[in-house]
Swiss-Prot record:
It is found in: Cytoplasm. Residues 91-243 form the Tyr recombinase domain. It comes from the Bacteria. The lineage of its organism: Bacteria, Bacillati, Bacillota, Bacilli, Lactobacillales. GO terms for cellular component: cytoplasm. One of its GO terms (biological process) is DNA transposition. Residues 1-72 form the Core-binding (CB) domain. It comes from Streptococcus suis (strain 05ZYH33). This is Tyrosine recombinase XerD-like. One of its GO terms (molecular function) is tyrosine-based site-specific recombinase activity. Belongs to the 'phage' integrase family. XerD-like subfamily. Putative tyrosine recombinase. Not involved in the cutting and rejoining of the recombining DNA molecules on dif(SL) site. Keywords: Cytoplasm, DNA integration, DNA recombination, DNA-binding. HAMAP family: Recomb_XerD_like.
Length: 243
């Protein structure tokens, strides 16, 4: 894959700075997908962009789509893959409708995926934030959860409904612990996918569940600036579509 990236960069007649930007974005893409290109790995990559500003997301997706086309055009892929973006006001409006989240609490054998879904929908956490969440950051007595990101801390109230689901996950270093290490993005994606499919909601991606959290906060009367702060965002710019 490294050689393919180099060949792709050489085919682009762009400045040195642009070459560096392409290289950085594509190396990051390969790291997240582990060099495996499939519809599932592309979804995992797209979920990893959730924390970025819209402009950065657009740039990275453009670079990856150009690279994917290059691979297909040079017979390095047997089909053309493409990262999909939401297009048109109608599809945006559809995505912003409130859903019945009580389905997340129904009994399920997919307990790990269930807790991941609950943390996203009720606390607005991203899969990457959940992956780094340690047991010490959870205080069930005071019903709070502390998230550390980029040197900043934010303390979130843990809904009492989530406490029973958290209790069995606090014995290791991480809430989702792999012998003292964190699991991969692919693991979180797979666990969430298993769970939402089991409750008949295969379209409830991490992004959609996070949107449900935002919509709930709006219904409770909070401003976009307040919600941005709760989500750990520096500005509310990426939340403009919720106005």
């Amino acid at each position: 894959m490294k050689q393919a990236i180099e060949s792709f960069i050489q085919s682009k007649k762009v400045s040195v700075n642009s070459q560096k930007s392409y290289t950085y974005d594509l190396q990051q893409f390969v790291t997240v997908t582990k060099g495996e290109i499939s519809q599932q790995s592309l979804l995992v990559y797209q979920q990893s962009l959730l924390d970025l500003k819209p402009a950065a997301q657009k740039r990275k997706m453009s670079a990856v789509n150009q690279f994917l086309y290059f691979l297909y055009e040079n017979n390095l892929l047997d089909r053309f893959y493409k990262l999909q973006t939401t297009s048109g006001p109608a599809s945006v409006k559809k995505k912003l409708e409130r859903e019945d989240l009580t389905l997340l609490f129904q009994e399920s054998p997919w307990l790990e995926g269930q807790l991941i879904a609950l943390l996203i929908a009720y606390l607005g956490l991203t899969p990457s934030e959940i992956a780094e969440l340690t047991s010490q950051q959870v205080n069930l007595d005071f019903q709070v959860l502390t998230v550390e990101k980029g040197g900043a801390k934010r303390v979130l109230t843990l809904p009492k409904e989530l406490i029973p689901y958290m209790e069995s996950h606090l014995s290791g270093r991480y809430v989702f612990d792999k012998k003292g290490q964190t699991y991969s993005r692919q693991w979180f994606f797979n666990r969430l996918t298993e769970f939402v499919q089991s409750i008949g909601k295969p379209d409830w991606t991490a992004q959609k569940l996070r949107e449900q959290y935002i919509l709930k906060q709006i219904d409770e009367g909070k401003s976009l600036d307040q919600i941005a702060k709760q989500l750990g965002l520096k500005t509310s710019m990426s939340l403009e579509k919720f106005r």
